[in-house]
């Protein structure tokens, strides 16, 4: 009893230690299937930078059209009423005396810490052409911009956090691309051609085939970035001698891997985006290729505005796919990134409309809500110890066993009764790491019950060996049953086909004969009557000696067209034809001619196909040229064509003939 109590105590202690040791692994396993920690929603932060007057600019002595009020607000003249000003409120405002360090430290540097938490961040430079976007992002050797400052600080952070002795190992990679005329081009590998933008099952935007360069120091970054920057497309316009003709995107990825259990891994992305500026082709003087480039830039920026409006209005469809720029910015606007928009504006009055447009876009963008999250997953090799322990539970290979057939069939209970190594006891509990302590206690009770039964010599039917054998036997039986069913189905199908063929032979012998021996037994065709205008009816009571015969039965024989064309049989077929007496036709013509020569315009309208206009034409022609000599002279009237004349005769002569026939009857 004492030994049994000590064994139970050891098992209880091992269960508690196992639950505490692998609780983190259970959480990581949940994160692998999408259970990520989500921080609260984050609004897109907007900063506005006012560049100084450019040297040599005409009208530099004039007062600027924009004026800063404090560190977060500015005002601009109202073009509708010059006595008023429009005020804008943003997260930050940097005047014309602000430096590159002020902008970086105030707006960009605070979001870098999110990368080490496995979250995404984005920095976008927006504004019209010549407003200083590229200077803000790249800068100069004397005044470095956002990109070199961010990379320098980020690499320093990764070196500190990934140093020896720290729980995480960090690595940094970079990619650099441009969107030129709706084509995604790799600036690190210009020969790669147009790349496609994809979306994985978790909604992450990726570009297959995009180059990724590992960097561990700022020197590594410069070695890759400087040659790639020279590959970006630039051109000269009237407003800017080095105008960016494409949108440039620098993607920096930070991978983190935990050195200790539960061996988690994180991935954070930093998007540094230099957007091309919107252009007014009337002022830039773009022609040819420059005009085509300007059209592509303005179109993508217009779609960007539509995306912002759709997000603010809560529309069910956000047009990310209408442009490759918005498709790539899906994480930055309304996605999972901490985003900062730097709107660059110019103080000159000639850029007033562009400045107002940029400020309105910035004001709409600050209403966009992003939902960042920490993307954690479990490293693949973290599941290795669990798999090894499961293999150990299956026992040694068959070749190393020296047991009889009875032991191999039933299994030995000794390994379950005696305490084994710690790994063998911990591995079953690792599967249950997500359960609460009460459930673990119940499983321990069941384990004790099974152990007590095993110690009494009862066969353990739940051993892995037994389970495999029973499962294999069940699978073999199911396979045999399936084969028998398939064979039986084929026999039934063959029998049904034979029955159908026999029924066709018995009930449809003519269908199985050759075509040349088939006999045509068609029914006698019905008589057909040709119904002419005014429903001409055959008068059965008419006298055979009558002067006018409207219908006459005319019989003629036709050959039946058989399928094989071999039967010489001929069938007589009766049909009805319309035959009008010449006297009736002459009488109808004369009556129409009298009406044309003597009738008024109202009388003429009683004729078919004659309306008020044609009646007036007939009366006028008759007054000028005299009476008609024949009905066909009606075609000489101006406005009556030959086709109209034929239609007139058919409609009126037959109608009058039928009317006279009915009157005679």
UniProtKB/Swiss-Prot annotation:
Residues bound to ATP: 127-134
CDD domains (alphabetical): KISc_KID_like (cd01376)
Family: Belongs to the TRAFAC class myosin-kinesin ATPase superfamily. Kinesin family.
Processing after translation: Ubiquitinated; mediated by SIAH1 and leading to its subsequent proteasomal degradation.
Chain positions found as Phosphoserine: 412, 427, 452, 543, 562, 581
Tissue note: Expressed in bone, cartilage, joint capsule, ligament, skin, and primary cultured chondrocytes.
Region (Disordered) residue spans: 379-428
Xref: Pfam families: HHH_3 (PF12836), Kinesin (PF00225)
Highest taxon listed in the record's lineage: Eukaryota
InterPro entries tied to this protein: Hlx-hairpin-Hlx_DNA-bd_motif, Kinesin-like_fam, Kinesin_motor_CS, Kinesin_motor_dom, Kinesin_motor_dom_sf, P-loop_NTPase, RuvA_2-like
Role description: Kinesin family member that is involved in spindle formation and the movements of chromosomes during mitosis and meiosis. Binds to microtubules and to DNA. Plays a role in congression of laterally attached chromosomes in NDC80-depleted cells.
Signal peptide: none
Subunit structure: Interacts with FAM83D. Interacts with SIAH1.
SMART domains xref list: HhH1, KISc
One GO CC term, this protein: mitotic spindle
Annotated compartments: Nucleus; Cytoplasm, Cytoskeleton
PANTHER family in alphabetical order: CHROMOSOME-ASSOCIATED KINESIN KIF4A-RELATED, KINESIN-LIKE PROTEIN
SUPFAM superfamilies found in the cross-reference section: P-loop containing nucleoside triphosphate hydrolases, RuvA domain 2-like
UniProt entry tagged with the keyword Ubl conjugation: yes
Location in chain, cross-link Glycyl lysine isopeptide (Lys-Gly) (interchain with G-Cter in SUMO2): 465
Predominant location: nucleus
Transmembrane domains' residue ranges: none
Biased composition (Low complexity): 412-428
Name of the molecule in the record: Kinesin-like protein KIF22
Record GO terms (molecular function): ATP binding; ATP hydrolysis activity; DNA binding; microtubule binding; microtubule motor activity
Disease entry from the Swiss-Prot or TrEMBL record: Spondyloepimetaphyseal dysplasia with joint laxity, 2: A bone disease characterized by short stature, distinctive midface retrusion, progressive knee malalignment (genu valgum and/or varum), generalized ligamentous laxity, and mild spinal deformity. Intellectual development is not impaired.
Organism for this UniProt entry: Homo sapiens
């Amino acid at each position: 009893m004492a030994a049994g109590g000590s064994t139970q105590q050891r098992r209880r202690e091992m269960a508690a230690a196992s639950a505490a040791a692998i609780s983190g692994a259970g959480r990581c396993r949940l994160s692998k299937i999408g259970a990520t920690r989500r921080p609260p929603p984050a609004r897109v932060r907007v900063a506005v930078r006012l560049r100084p007057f450019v040297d040599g600019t005409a009208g530099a002595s004039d007062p600027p059209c924009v004026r800063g009020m404090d560190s977060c607000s500015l005002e601009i003249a109202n073009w509708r009423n010059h006595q008023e000003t429009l005020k804008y409120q943003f997260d930050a405002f940097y005047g014309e005396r602000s430096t590159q360090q002020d902008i970086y430290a105030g707006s960009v540097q605070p979001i870098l810490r999110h990368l080490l938490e496995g979250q995404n961040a984005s920095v976008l430079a927006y504004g019209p052409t010549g407003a200083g976007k590229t200077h803000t992002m790249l800068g100069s050797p004397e005044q470095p911009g956002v990109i070199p400052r961010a990379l320098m600080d980020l690499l320093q952070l990764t070196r500190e956090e990934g140093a020896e002795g720290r729980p995480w190992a960090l690595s940094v990679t970079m990619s650099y691309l441009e969107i030129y005329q709706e084509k995604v081009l790799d600036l690190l590998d210009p020969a790669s051609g147009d790349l496609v933008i994809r979306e994985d099952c978790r909604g992450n935007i990726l570009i297959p085939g995009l180059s990724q360069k590992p960097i561990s120091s700022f020197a590594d970054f410069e070695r890759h970035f400087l040659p790639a920057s020279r590959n970006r497309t630039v051109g000269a316009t009237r407003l800017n001698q080095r105008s960016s003709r494409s949108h440039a995107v620098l993607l920096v990825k930070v991978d983190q891997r935990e050195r200790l259990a539960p061996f988690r891994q994180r991935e954070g992305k930093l998007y540094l985006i230099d957007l091309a500026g919107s252009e007014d082709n009337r002022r830039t003087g773009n022609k040819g290729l420059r005009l085509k480039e300007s059209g592509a830039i303005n179109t993508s920026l217009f779609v960007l505005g539509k995306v912002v409006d759709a997000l603010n209005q809560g529309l069910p469809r956000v047009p990310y796919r209408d442009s490759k720029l918005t498709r790539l910015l899906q994480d930055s606007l309304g996605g999972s990134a901490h985003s900062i928009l730097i709107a660059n504006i110019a103080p000159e009055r000639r850029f007033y409309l562009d400045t107002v447009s940029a400020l309105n876009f910035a004001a709409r963008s600050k209403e966009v809500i992003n939902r960042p999250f920490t993307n954690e997953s479990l490293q693949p090799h973290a599941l290795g110890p669990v798999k090894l322990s499961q293999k150990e539970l299956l026992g040694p290979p068959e070749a190393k066993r020296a047991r009889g057939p009875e032991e191999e069939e039933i299994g030995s209970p000794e390994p379950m009764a005696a305490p084994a190594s710690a790994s063998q006891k911990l591995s079953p509990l690792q599967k249950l790491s997500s359960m609460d302590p009460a459930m673990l206690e119940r499983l321990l009770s069941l384990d004790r019950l099974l152990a007590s039964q095993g110690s009494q010599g009862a066969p353990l039917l739940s051993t892995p060996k037994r389970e495999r054998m029973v499962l294999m036997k069940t699978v073999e039986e199911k396979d045999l049953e399936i084969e028998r069913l398939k064979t039986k189905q084929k026999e039934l199908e063959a029998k049904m086909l034979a029955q159908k063929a026999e029924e066709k032979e018995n009930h449809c012998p003519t269908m199985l004969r050759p075509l040349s021996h088939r006999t045509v037994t068609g029914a006698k065709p019905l008589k057909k009557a040709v119904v002419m205008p005014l429903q001409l009816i055959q008068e059965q009571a008419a006298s055979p000696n009558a002067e006018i015969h409207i219908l006459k039965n005319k019989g003629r024989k036709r050959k039946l067209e058989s399928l094989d064309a071999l039967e010489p049989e001929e069938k007589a077929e009766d049909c009805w034809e319309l035959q009008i007496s010449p006297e009736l036709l002459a009488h109808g013509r004369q009556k129409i001619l009298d009406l044309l020569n003597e009738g008024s315009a109202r009388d003429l309208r009683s004729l078919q196909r004659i309306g008020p206009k044609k009646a007036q034409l007939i009366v006028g022609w008759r007054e000028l040229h005299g009476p008609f000599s024949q009905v066909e002279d009606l075609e000489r009237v101006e406005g009556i064509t030959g086709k109209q004349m034929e239609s007139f005769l058919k409609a009126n002569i037959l109608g009058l003939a039928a009317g006279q026939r009915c009157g005679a009857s």
